[in-house]
Amino acid sequence: LERKKDFKLKYERVDLNGLLDKIVEQQSIKSSKPFHVGLESMPDRIILEADRTHLYNILSNILDNAIKYSGDSPHIQITAEERNGSVIIRITDNGIGIEEEHLAHIFDKFYRVSNSKRPPVRGYGIGLFYVKTMIHMHNGTIRVESQPGKGSCFIITLPQTHERQEIDIIG
């Protein structure tokens, strides 16, 4: 992780609805506990230009965290909308939430929230760092709203189109 690597984003047209269906299906196969995901308030089809592999990993990582940090019966709501040339995706869970003092750091490399009130969750603290890095490379933004004991909502905003070219990334 300390070495710099060259990446290339390969933009292509991505059907967000189909991608989300695939992510939910894959999570249901790999998850050790049952969960419910609602894909509501979404247009029939949202198309955006993105690197399909990285977008899959971004959304899968956030959904995986929502499941891990939501106790025995996770309920996750995913919504998406098109607005002013952007796509806004919200992933909301009914999990343990994130305390205010941690919100500014959860996207930092290797940052882990310590909480003695819950059993430890496996991880290295790089998932959300990767998520934020890749979203920024797509010229997008991510933010989180959270209340301890009530859950979290991750809000991703991505441009709907990009110039048709490969973009070099050094990270």
Question: Where are the predicted features?
Answer:
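Conserved micro-motifs of the catalytic ATP-binding
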Residues: 4-9, 45-50
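A conserved beta-strand-to-alpha-helix junction within the catalytic ATP-binding
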Residues: 10-25
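Short conserved segments within the C-terminal catalytic ATPase subdomain
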Residues: 30-39
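Short helix-loop "hinge" at the ATP-lid/N-box region of the Bergerat-fold HATPase_c
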Residues: 66-67
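Short beta-strand/loop element within the Bergerat-fold HATPase_c
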Residues: 73-85
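Short conserved segment of the HATPase_c
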Residues: 98-110
